[in-house]
């Protein structure tokens, strides 16, 4: 069974220590986040994860896009929509993705393989991640241009489609769209579906959508979105697994969250194994990709790494 992560990893920044780093720091060119990306990549590869991330160490999932997309800004830690939304003139995340690929490939050449349209067999790579348009809009205060949130969602989808294309060109093995707000009930699911379809349109690599939270009531609708992988949490929200009974997957794989990201407690091998077996009984191992419930940014490094190792040790047996 393939393994992946949802995205974020504990961001451990490093002060400049070498002479060249100190000189760079004097001139304001030292990037403290590169060491955090490197650590996140090394830990994920060390744990045996197949499709890793760059760790999303730079900023919150909303702020990193709100600071870069035309028509959006962040003021006093509040994301805002202040004008007509347009794509960023340059990629927001491609440089970190390319650096992560370089680091991973330096550890194992497998992570440098050419991305494929399907995730079959033995696949290694780095995923590119965008925060979904519905989540960005419903996390922001609208102060200009838009009277309807739905219109902002669609414009953001077109802007994020450009970013997804940047990530694909940068070597992403998967493009993932994070849409946690869909599970809250405040988002128009039909608008969200249209927006995700706009982002995914024309991409030559697999597209994944992550929706955390309880999704049993909307599960069937989420499986109609134009993505190849639908990712949910099953460890922290056991009720979600009931939605897998007699489900029509519409040809999708399920990202099967099987370790809880909300606690530092490290699951036993038996816990993870029993949960994955329940998923296999319902939809089959061939339709599953094992991953944590959600991002691991708030966990300690020791907990995050240990959880990933337990998960991989179980998943590789299926």
Language model region names:
Residues 1-318:
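Domain-level signal for soluble alpha/beta catalytic cores
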């Amino acid at each position: 069974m393939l393994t992946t992560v949802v995205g974020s990893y504990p961001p451990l920044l490093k002060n400049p220590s070498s002479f060249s780093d100190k000189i760079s720091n004097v001139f304001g060119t030292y990037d403290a986040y590169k060491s955090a990306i490197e650590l996140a990549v090394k830990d994920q590869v060390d744990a045996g994860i197949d499709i890793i991330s760059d760790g999303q160490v730079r900023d919150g999932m909303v702020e990193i896009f709100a600071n870069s997309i035309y028509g959006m800004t962040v003021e006093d830690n509040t994301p805002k929509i202040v004008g007509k939304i347009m794509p960023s003139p340059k990629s927001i995340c491609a440089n970190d993705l390319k650096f992560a690929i370089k680091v991973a490939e330096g550890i194992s050449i497998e992570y440098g393989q050419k991305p494929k349209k399907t995730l079959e067999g033995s696949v290694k790579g780095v995923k590119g991640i965008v925060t979904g348009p519905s989540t960005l809009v419903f996390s922001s205060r609208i102060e200009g241009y838009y009277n309807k949130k739905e219109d902002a969602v669609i414009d953001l989808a077109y802007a994020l489609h450009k970013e997804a294309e940047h990530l694909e060109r940068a070597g992403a093995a998967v493009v993932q769209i994070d849409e946690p707000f869909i599970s809250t009930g405040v988002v128009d699911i039909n608008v969200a579906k249209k927006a995700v379809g706009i982002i995914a349109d024309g991409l030559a690599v697999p597209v994944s959508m992550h929706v955390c939270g309880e999704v049993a009531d909307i599960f069937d609708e989420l499986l109609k979105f134009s993505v190849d992988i639908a990712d949910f949490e099953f460890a922290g929200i056991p009720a979600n697994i009931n939605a897998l009974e007699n489900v029509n997957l519409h040809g999708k794989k399920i990202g099967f969250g099987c370790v809880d990201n909300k606690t530092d407690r490290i699951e036993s091998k038996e816990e993870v194994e029993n949960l994955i077996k329940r998923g296999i009984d319902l939809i089959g191992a061939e339709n599953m990709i094992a991953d944590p419930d959600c991002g691991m940014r708030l966990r300690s490094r020791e907990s995050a790494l240990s959880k990933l190792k337990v998960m991989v040790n179980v998943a590789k047996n299926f």
